[in-house]
């Protein structure tokens, strides 16, 4: 009986430890990276282990052209400044489209993508989705929108071995992130869903057409007084 009690006690301790790691670790990371630059993400580490290079240069949000900020919001998350991490309107629309026979699509916000890129592995299983939702709630509670956008634009993948706006601008267009034109910004925003297959610097017909659409929408994005929703 004592042996069984001991095993049960150790089992509970292990479960408690896992609970703390899964739920407490994101909180610690978010507190640190609320002010500190992000040195690497799980995806960057994975790509390095696969033998891929790493081009990345952290820059503050004010060193990223407003055109790129507008383009990314217009393309990836039009209600970024209004929602609290989850765009319920977009989720309802995606579900309605699915019920009409369309393929079920994601309604991932910039907040969700930032949480995923910062702390999680790639994949579509329910465990990762659940952790992503939890991390997104924490992210929105602890970070202002400006910080979410700043981190996203510095860690997102923009091509094989290319991470962040500064590296992407220099790789694809030979300019700094601050010097991007509206057209270049729109092209960079459009390739985000598939950056390893689509090229902002050598756009195909679809990317070019989509970029023109996004460029037309950019003027409607209000960045606020602080340059990111504030």
Swiss-Prot record:
Highest taxon of source: Bacteria
Keyword Cell membrane in record: yes
One annotated GO molecular function: peptidoglycan glycosyltransferase activity
GO terms, biological process: cell wall organization; peptidoglycan biosynthetic process; regulation of cell shape
Keyword rRNA-binding in record: no
UniProt name for this protein: Biosynthetic peptidoglycan transglycosylase
Membrane topology: Single-pass membrane protein
Record's GO cellular component terms: peptidoglycan-based cell wall; plasma membrane
EC number, as in UniProt: 2.4.99.28
